[in-house]
């Protein structure tokens, strides 16, 4: 009978997202992830072939969060382009580390 997976891919990505959000992408490592998840680095390598694969999926998660943030809280009567601009500035203020990641990754 195969062993039960206790650390899922989603759990790893969520922990990586929180590290990137609080401390920045430069602090993200398998050791930091393992520490946050309270496990060894083995489950991380079990779910992802390498760090690049995990980072690729993390960038997708960050990008989705960024676009959802931009499109949230739309108010009727205000042009959409203005609201997106305001939300862009809000994102930069509230999510400093993720904003840097978005700017570096997509510039």
What role is predicted for each listed range?
Residues 3, 48-49, 85:
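Tryptophan-centric aromatic hotspots in well-structured domains and transmembrane helices
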Residues 90, 94-107:
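Short secondary-structure transition hinges
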Residues 6, 31, 60, 92-93:
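Alpha-helix N-cap/helix-start motif at coil-to-helix transitions, marked by capping-box chemistry
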Residues 1-7:
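N-terminal intrinsically disordered/low-complexity leader segments
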Residues 11-18, 53-79, 83-90, 105:
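Alpha-helical structural segments
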Residues 28-29, 80-83, 97:
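Alpha-helix N-cap and coil->helix boundary residues
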Residues 11, 19-53, 57:
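Helix-turn-helix
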């Amino acid at each position: 009978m195969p062993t039960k997976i206790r650390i899922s891919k989603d759990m790893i990505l969520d922990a990586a997202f929180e590290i990137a959000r609080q401390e920045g992408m430069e602090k993200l490592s398998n050791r930091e992830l393992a520490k946050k998840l309270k496990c060894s680095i083995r489950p991380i390598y079990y779910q992802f072939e390498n760090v690049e694969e995990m980072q690729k999926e993390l960038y997708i998660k960050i990008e989705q969060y960024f676009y959802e943030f931009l499109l949230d809280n739309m108010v009727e009567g205000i042009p959409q382009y203005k609201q997106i601009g305001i939300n862009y500035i809000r994102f930069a203020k509230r999510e400093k580390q993720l904003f840097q990641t978005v700017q570096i990754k997509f510039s």
